[in-house]
Swiss-Prot record:
Encoding gene per record: murG
A molecular function (GO) term: undecaprenyldiphospho-muramoylpentapeptide beta-N-acetylglucosaminyltransferase activity
Enzyme class (EC, first level): transferase
Keywords: Cell cycle, Cell division, Cell membrane, Cell shape, Cell wall biogenesis/degradation, Glycosyltransferase, Membrane, Peptidoglycan synthesis, Transferase
Entry-linked Pfam families: Glyco_tran_28_C, Glyco_transf_28
PANTHER family, alphabetized: GLYCOSYLTRANSFERASE, UDP-N-ACETYLGLUCOSAMINE--N-ACETYLMURAMYL-(PENTAPEPTIDE) PYROPHOSPHORYL-UNDECAPRENOL N-ACETYLGLUCOSAMINE TRANSFERASE 1
Protein's UniProt name: UDP-N-acetylglucosamine--N-acetylmuramyl-(pentapeptide) pyrophosphoryl-undecaprenol N-acetylglucosamine transferase
SUPFAM superfamilies: UDP-Glycosyltransferase/glycogen phosphorylase
Family of this protein: Belongs to the glycosyltransferase 28 family. MurG subfamily.
Known role: Cell wall formation. Catalyzes the transfer of a GlcNAc subunit on undecaprenyl-pyrophosphoryl-MurNAc-pentapeptide (lipid intermediate I) to form undecaprenyl-pyrophosphoryl-MurNAc-(pentapeptide)GlcNAc (lipid intermediate II).
InterPro entries: GlcNAc_MurG, Glyco_trans_28_C, GlycoTrans_28_N
Length: 356
């Protein structure tokens, strides 16, 4: 039995692959530990999964010259010292990083103690921590060809409960969610943080879209996952909204079309389920979401946030919601982008790092 520390946090895109990999490692008999921050989504999801969880302060790299850049080295080395103590106390044998705020101190601590580490990059464009750390890693796993020049294509690990849900009966899934089992489902979500702009334009577009679909005898309903920051109640026929959903397996199994951000985990999950999508990439960061779906025109429509409007959404939605054959072709194309057994593939890299 090996002792493995998984470092990642901040967004679901870092945390969900961590949880999926932890499942596989536990089945193989490894002792797994997780490192994150107390502020990110991992502070809720990881402890609920039964994994020993350690936190360090959130420490984003300052992108602009300011007093924060002067303090950064001291705070960074303080975090490295904290991670070192965790690695020593729990006799960690390999560190696995998924990027994000906690990965860089974890990599640095591993190097200082001569502990091998593995880098996993889910995005088409890596963040700074993974970009630098990949040069010294024992193994590097990627989800998009070319993301890191030394990377092996392994895919983005998906939680076991979600992969199992890919075979659910969509009608039963709709009933589990309290939805109409006859109407097709448009699922809308803006990533783990939600998106005020997507929420606003979607609510403006839906009344006309649903009305015209009904008139043409294309019967649809909407499940809108708005995010915790949204507090607007909307009374609209065939429209349901929730701030967060724990049972995403049922939601994805029931969905006939999705409107969402283009985070790496979201894209991997939709491809696994074969769901046609309208992606609205998050425009900030280092542009990774745009890159994540730039090669997927056959499986999705892509709207850049600068082009997002009520009229554009109405046009895209109506075109897809009234064309069953096109959605079916997009579904088939999406499945071709899915990488099966990504968690097992990544676990194999860890075994390689442990044995070398």
């Amino acid at each position: 039995m090996s002792r493995i520390l998984l470092a990642g946090g901040g967004t679901a895109g870092h945390v969900n692959p961590l949880l999926a990999l932890a499942d596989v490692l536990k089945v193989s008999g490894h002792a797994t530990f997780a490192l994150g921050t107390s502020e990110g989504i991992e502070s809720r999801l990881v402890p609920n999964s039964g994994i020993d969880f350690f936190t360090i302060p959130k420490l984003p790299f300052p992108r602009r010259t300011s007093r924060h850049i002067l303090c950064f080295p001291f705070k960074f080395f303080s975090s490295v010292k904290l991670v070192r103590s965790i690695l020593i106390e729990h006799k960690i044998q390999v560190v696995v990083g998924f990027g994000g705020y906690v990965a860089a101190p974890a990599y640095a601590a591993a190097i200082s103690l001569n502990i091998p580490y593995v880098v996993h990059e889910s995005n088409a464009r890596p963040g700074l921590a993974n970009l630098l750390a990949a040069h010294f890693a024992k193994c590097v796993g990627i989800s998009v060809i070319g993301a890191l020049p030394c990377g092996k294509l392994v895919g983005t690990p998906i939680r076991r409960d979600l992969t199992a849900a890919a075979s659910f009966d969509p009608v039963l899934a709709k009933e589990k969610l309290g939805l109409d089992p006859v109407r097709k489902l448009l699922l809308v979500f803006g990533g783990s943080q939600g998106s005020a702009k997507i929420n606003m334009h979607m609510r403006a577009a839906l009344p006309r879209v649903l009305k015209l679909c009904d008139e043409k005898n294309y019967l649809w309903q909407v499940l809108h996952i708005t995010g915790y920051g949204d507090s607007i109640d909307v009374n609209m026929p065939h429209y349901s909204s929730v701030r967060y959903m724990d049972s995403m397996g049922y939601a994805l199994s029931a969905a006939d079309l999705v409107v969402s951000r283009a985070g790496s985990s979201t894209v991997a999950e939709l491809c696994t389920f074969g769901i046609p999508a309208i992606y609205i990439p998050y425009p900030f960061g280092n542009g990774e979401q745009r890159r994540n779906v730039s090669h997927m025109e056959s499986a999705a429509r892509i709207i850049q946030e600068n082009d997002l409007s009520q009229i554009r959404l109405e046009d895209e939605l109506l075109e897809l919601m009234t064309d069953d054959e096109r959605r079916e072709a997009m579904s088939i194309a999406a499945k071709r982008f899915a990488i099966c057994n990504a968690a097992q593939n990544t676990a194999s890299l860890i075994e390689l790092a442990l044995s070398s």
